[in-house]
Amino acid sequence: MEPQLILGSSSPRRKSILQYFRIPFTCISPSFEERSVPYQGDPAAYSQELAVGKAESIVQDHNPEGVILTADTVVIYKGKVFNKPSSRDEAIEMLKTLSGQTHSIITSVALLQQKKLMVGQETTQVTFNQLPEKYLGRYVEAFSTLDKCGGYSTQEGGGLIIHNIQGCAYNVQGLPIRTLYHLLLEFDINLWDYLV
């Protein structure tokens, strides 16, 4: 019997990563309001709370039978969380701050089925090139970065801004495959069985 997997996300990047496998899944956007959760200084706990909140909102709104998969990614630099920018100007300021620096990306992945909840995390270090300020507005507009935490994308023009990535590149895109693989095993779903 095929597993019922529900991707609780509107992220095209997470959907694309999951489509690397033949595992059937449906998408439901969570109603959880991320900005309702205040950041209290622990980025790992914050990311986990958001991922779990998204999964619980899907249960509350839809009560599906399958395994719900949600994730939350945060960018951290010098103790500050960089969420999705709310404006072009905020995205540009984020890029200026991260220019030439190394920051952390934490993604929490939550799987929830009925009362069974499993959560995992991945942390990756990303170092930016020195960014020419006069082009940052163009970058934000060209790659529609307002829906991406930290105001940037590794897939679209990432080579212009990223010097190197230490750790899981899929984590930077919002869904670390290694973490997902281990969590799915707890629900008797093996990604090796779903290779394309």
From Swiss-Prot:
E.C. number(s) listed in UniProt: 3.6.1.9
Cellular component per GO, a single term: cytoplasm
Keyword annotations of the record: Cytoplasm, Hydrolase, Nucleotide metabolism
Residues annotated as transmembrane: none
Highest taxon of the lineage: Bacteria
Catalytic activities: dTTP + H2O = dTMP + diphosphate + H(+); UTP + H2O = UMP + diphosphate + H(+)
Organism this protein belongs to: Chlamydia caviae (strain ATCC VR-813 / DSM 19441 / 03DC25 / GPIC) (Chlamydophila caviae)
Site (Important for substrate specificity): R13, T73, Q155
Protein name as it appears in the record: dTTP/UTP pyrophosphatase
